[in-house]
């Protein structure tokens, strides 16, 4: 339904002459005097636009002129209801330029403008500004339609009009992905722009995002909103869709998936036509950046299509004029997509589905958020969940004590990551910290999506300081100086815009355990960037030259006329969205164990994204080896042992032993051991043993033993032995020991052994040992051995060890050994050790990713859409205008008349008197004429 102002006055030609004309005019003005002033200010009537109803050519068009004093247009939900005055809609029959702006509220009034099409304009006052980006240009094309108007992804269009202080006649409105399409019909000049059926369509296209619903602004990415055109999604051919990722995606290790598309464009496509790509709600296209952008599809150095993200998170591409001059256009597109932390909060399987039209791709992946880091009673994990490079800000979320352990005197510190050129600014002016208490650890989401309203804000109860440059410190001041529940720390900080480094942070938790042992645990956070790309090409199509006019032919519309939907799009865009797709993800890894052993681990991770992990280990080992051996052995040990032992022992031992033995043994063994041990031992032994052994062995043994032992032992021994042993054994053992040791041993052993062995052994041992051992020994031996041995051992050892150690050790060892050993051994061992240790390691992870998806786009678009709108209907003359239209166009530029307010009673009285006088004159003249006859 359209608003039209119809004012027609008919004059009857009678023989009564000038007097009757005068009387009729006076009577008409007398009756309409009180209503005319009102009509000049706000007179609209409603009329339905039926397809067969003829419209008058003198109908006026209502357009919009913006106020100049910081007028703003709202982007909030509004409905196209012309009865309640909520929405102001202004549309020209050719083009309407729409821009987004921010700041103040809007007050709208009406200004009549000459044209052929009529639209509805209502008043709108004090509309709040919710637009997040300024310099956002879009185009809307409205054609005349036959009893229907098609809307594709139409957003609210609001216009501001003012008859005063108006210096610009262009239409200012807000739109996102506006595409209004229609076809002309005979004798139809008014577009049905305010049909009530469009209300839901308008509302659905408006972004009303709550905090962290999606970590980007849809308004900000609609910088190149598509002009109106046809949705040709279902006309694309040779469509291919793919989801490229591993079976597992690690979002907190910069993990992402690639969405790949390919298609052919029909030759009938023209500038302004669009197609849609559906993106699943489990994915977003921004990662941790505050805004998301999609790459343009390029054909060499020309832009084939520009894309924006609509309010549902889907992507809409609009073709440029490249397709107007090309045939057989083909295009490919790749976009990085990230697991959405709000819609996927827990680790588990997720099915992803994306597509173009009826062609879709599905893939089920395991989303693994990985667990927090834990060291004894300390646990911590953090993530960088938002970056805004426009405002140079970031947000980091840290889980403190997510395991819910008891931590005494807990302290959290935040620093720049060591050995990096981090661009973070940490000080009181640039850093804001909020602390929340979590009553139940199960309430923590694994994706680190946090709704602060669900937790208790205890920021005022903790002590937050900045003791050193680029460092903050949070002390949890609880009544008993300990915490037993998780806490969430949210850090809002700033980035140095002049720094060339990346964002890299380290968070460290300190505290005592129940044994009053001070420990620390750290977690590092960094950011990786990824980018997408789009490409295409086509074959030049022939251009048909302009043909001469033929008699009776309709005059073609000039190409520079605003009624050509594709000729004056006026977009001069300069965008960087191809190389900067605006997606950031975080990679978090870190382990910090405080152990007094000396461990060094260097980890190297290679991921498809760019992850860089650096773990820091602090190890301190103190060993004192003083070996003083004096072996003057002149022994003639006539011991002829010929041992041929073939033992096959398969033992599975789990031993937790703490032994301090001082033994002097002379053994001649020929062992063939095949052991596979997986040891993960946790022993805390404090032993003080004093053993004095004196062994004198003179043996002549010939033993042939064949032992097959399959032992599974679990021993916990603390021995203080004073042994005097004389053994000559020949064993062949095949042991498979599985020991789990984590030793924290402080042993002080004093052993004094005196051994005098006179042995002459000729052993030919061929041992093939396949051992998997993890030994943690702490020995303090002071041995004084006087051995005279003449051994000829021929051992052939081949060791193939594959160890994967993850040790967690806290050892304080002091070893003082005085030993003198002379051994000539050739061992063939094939060991496969798998030890699980948590050590304090300084690991440097160097990952190489080519990703840059944080894009900054500069768009400067100039669109000119506002001409005389002289669209020539098929039944009109060539020039399309008559004298009345020209006069109306001229008069429309003049301001409205000052109607004022007259006294209605006086006016009616005057006109009544004049009408009476006229009537008397009329009757008198009739009588005179009658008398003459």
Swiss-Prot record:
First and last residue of the signal peptide: 1-39
Source organism, top-level taxon: Bacteria
Ligand binding A region: region residues: 40-542
Modified residues (Pentaglycyl murein peptidoglycan amidated threonine): 899
Coiled-coil intervals, chain numbering: none
Residue span of motif YSIRK-G/S signaling motif: 9-20
Keyword Secreted attributed: yes
Biased segments, Basic and acidic residues type: 887-896
Biased composition (Low complexity): 47-65, 106-132, 566-598, 862-880
Gene3D superfamilies (UniProt xref): 2.60.40.1280, 2.60.40.1290
Chain intervals with Polar residues compositional bias: 71-105, 133-200
Alphabetical keyword list: Cell wall, Peptidoglycan-anchor, Secreted, Signal, Virulence
Intracellular or extracellular location(s): Secreted, Cell wall
Effect annotated for changing residue 310 to A: Decrease in gamma-chain peptide-binding activity and in the degree of inhibition induced by Ca(2+). 3-fold decrease in gamma-chain peptide binding activity and decrease in the degree of inhibition induced by Ca(2+)
Locus of motif LPXTG sorting signal: 896-900
Membrane topology type: Peptidoglycan-anchor
Effect annotated for changing residue 321 to A: Dramatic decrease in gamma-chain peptide-binding activity and decrease in the degree of inhibition induced by Ca(2+)
Region called Disordered, residue ranges: 34-200, 529-904
SUPFAM superfamilies noted in UniProt: Bacterial adhesins
Miscellaneous comment text of the record: Fg-binding activity is regulated by the divalent cations Ca(2+) and Mn(2+).
Function: Cell surface-associated protein implicated in virulence. Promotes bacterial attachment exclusively to the gamma-chain of human fibrinogen. Induces formation of bacterial clumps, which diminish the ability of group IIA phospholipase A2 to cause bacterial phospholipid hydrolysis and killing. Significantly decreases macrophage phagocytosis possibly thanks to the clumps, clumped bacteria being too large to be phagocytosed. Dominant factor responsible for human platelet aggregation, which may be an important mechanism for initiating infective endocarditis.
Family: Belongs to the serine-aspartate repeat-containing protein (SDr) family.
Protein name according to UniProt: Clumping factor A
Organism: Staphylococcus aureus (strain Newman)
Organism taxonomic ancestry: Bacteria, Bacillati, Bacillota, Bacilli, Bacillales
Gene giving rise to this polypeptide: clfA
């Amino acid at each position: 339904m359209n608003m039209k102002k119809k004012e027609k006055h008919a004059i009857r030609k009678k023989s009564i002459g000038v007097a009757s004309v005068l009387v009729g005019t006076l009577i008409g003005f007398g009756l309409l005097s009180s209503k005319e002033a009102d009509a000049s200010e706000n007179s609209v009537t409603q009329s339905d636009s039926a397809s067969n109803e003829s419209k008058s050519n003198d109908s006026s068009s209502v357009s919009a002129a913006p106020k100049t004093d910081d007028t703003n247009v709202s982007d909030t939900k509004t409905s196209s209801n012309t009865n309640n005055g909520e929405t102001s809609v202004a549309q020209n029959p050719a083009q309407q330029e729409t821009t987004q702006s921010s700041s103040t509220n809007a007050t709208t009034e009406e200004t009549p403008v000459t044209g052929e099409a009529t639209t509805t304009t209502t008043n709108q006052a004090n509309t709040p500004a919710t637009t997040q980006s300024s310099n956002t240009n879009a185009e809307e094309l409205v054609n005349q339609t036959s009893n229907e108007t098609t809307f594709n992804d139409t957003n609210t269009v609001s216009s501001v009009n003012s008859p005063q202080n108006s210096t610009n006649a262009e239409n200012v409105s807000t739109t996102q992905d506006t595409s209004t399409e229609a076809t002309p019909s005979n004798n139809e000049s008014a577009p049905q722009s305010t049909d009530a059926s469009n209300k839901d369509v308008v509302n659905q296209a408006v972004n009303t995002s709550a905090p962290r619903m999606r970590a980007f602004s849809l308004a900000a990415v609609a910088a190149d909103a598509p002009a109106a055109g046809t949705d040709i999604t279902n006309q694309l051919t040779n469509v291919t869709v793919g989801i490229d990722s591993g079976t597992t995606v690690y979002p907190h290790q910069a993990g992402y998936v690639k969405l790949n598309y390919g298609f052919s464009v029909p030759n009938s496509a023209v500038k302004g036509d669009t197609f849609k790509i559906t993106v699943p709600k489990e994915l977003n296209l921004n990662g941790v950046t505050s805004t998301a952008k999609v790459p343009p599809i390029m054909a060499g150095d020309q832009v084939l299509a520009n894309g924006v993200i609509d309010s549902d998170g889907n992507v809409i591409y609009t073709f440029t004029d490249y397709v107007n001059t090309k045939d057989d256009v083909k295009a490919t597109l790749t976009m990085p997509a990230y697991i959405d932390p709000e819609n996927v909060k827990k680790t588990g399987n997720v099915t992803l589905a994306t597509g173009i039209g009826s062609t879709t791709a599905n893939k089920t992946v395991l989303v693994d958020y990985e667990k927090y880091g834990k060291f004894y009673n300390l646990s911590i994990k953090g993530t960088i969940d938002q970056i805004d490079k426009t405002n140079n800000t970031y947000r980091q979320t840290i889980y403190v004590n997510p395991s819910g352990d008891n931590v005494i005197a807990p302290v959290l510190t935040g620093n720049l990551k060591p050995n990096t050129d981090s661009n973070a600014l940490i000080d009181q002016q640039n850093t804001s910290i909020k602390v929340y208490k979590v009553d139940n650890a199960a309430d923590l989401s694994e994706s680190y999506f946090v709704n602060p309203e669900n937790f208790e804000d205890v920021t005022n109860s903790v002590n937050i300081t900045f003791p050193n440059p680029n460092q903050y410190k949070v002390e949890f001041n609880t009544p008993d100086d300990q915490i037993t529940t998780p806490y969430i720390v949210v850090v809002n900080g700033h980035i140095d815009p002049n720094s060339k480094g990346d964002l890299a942070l380290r968070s460290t938790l300190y505290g005592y355990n129940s044994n009053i042992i001070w420990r620390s645990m750290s977690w590092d956070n960094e950011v990786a960037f990824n980018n997408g790309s789009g490409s295409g090409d086509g074959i030049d199509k022939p251009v048909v030259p302009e043909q001469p006019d033929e008699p009776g032919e309709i005059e073609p519309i000039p190409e520079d006329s605003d009624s050509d939907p594709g000729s004056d799009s006026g977009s001069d865009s300069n965008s960087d969205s191809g190389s900067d797709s605006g997606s950031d993800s975080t990679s978090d890894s870190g382990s910090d164990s405080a152990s007094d052993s000396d461990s060094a681990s260097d980890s190297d991770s290679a991921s498809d994204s760019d992850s860089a992990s650096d773990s820091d280990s602090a190890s301190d080992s103190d060993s004192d080896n003083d070996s003083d051996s004096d072996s003057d052995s002149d022994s003639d040990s006539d011991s002829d042992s010929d041992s041929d032992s073939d033992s096959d022992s398969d033992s599975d031992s789990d031993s937790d032993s703490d032994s301090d033995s001082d033994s002097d043994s002379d053994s001649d063994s020929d062992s063939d051991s095949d052991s596979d041990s997986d040891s993960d031992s946790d022993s805390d032994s404090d032993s003080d043993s004093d053993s004095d052994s004196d062994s004198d062995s003179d043996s002549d043994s010939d033993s042939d033993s064949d032992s097959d032992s399959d032992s599974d032992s679990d021993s916990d021994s603390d021995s203080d032995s004073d042994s005097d042993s004389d053994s000559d054994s020949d064993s062949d053992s095949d042991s498979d020991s599985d020991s789990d040791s984590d030793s924290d041993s402080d042993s002080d052993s004093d052993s004094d052994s005196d051994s005098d062995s006179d042995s002459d052994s000729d052993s030919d041992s061929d041992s093939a040992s396949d051992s998997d051992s993890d030994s943690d020994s702490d020995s303090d031996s002071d041995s004084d051995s006087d051995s005279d041995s003449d051994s000829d051992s021929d051992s052939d050892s081949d060791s193939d060890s594959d160890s994967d150690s993850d040790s967690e050790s806290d050892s304080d060892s002091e070893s003082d050994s005085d030993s003198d050993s002379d051994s000539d051994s050739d061992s063939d061992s094939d060991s496969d050790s798998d030890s699980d240790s948590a050590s304090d390691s300084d690991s440097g992870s160097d990952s190489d990713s080519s990703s840059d998806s944080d894009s900054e786009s500069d768009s400067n678009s100039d669109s000119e859409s506002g001409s005389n709108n002289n669209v020539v209907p098929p039944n009109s003359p060539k020039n399309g205008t008559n004298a009345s239209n020209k006069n109306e166009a001229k008069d429309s530029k003049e301001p409205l008349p000052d109607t004022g307010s007259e006294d209605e009673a006086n006016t009616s009285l005057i006109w009544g008197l004049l009408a009476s006088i006229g009537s008397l004159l009329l009757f008198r003249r009739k009588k005179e004429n009658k008398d003459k006859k």
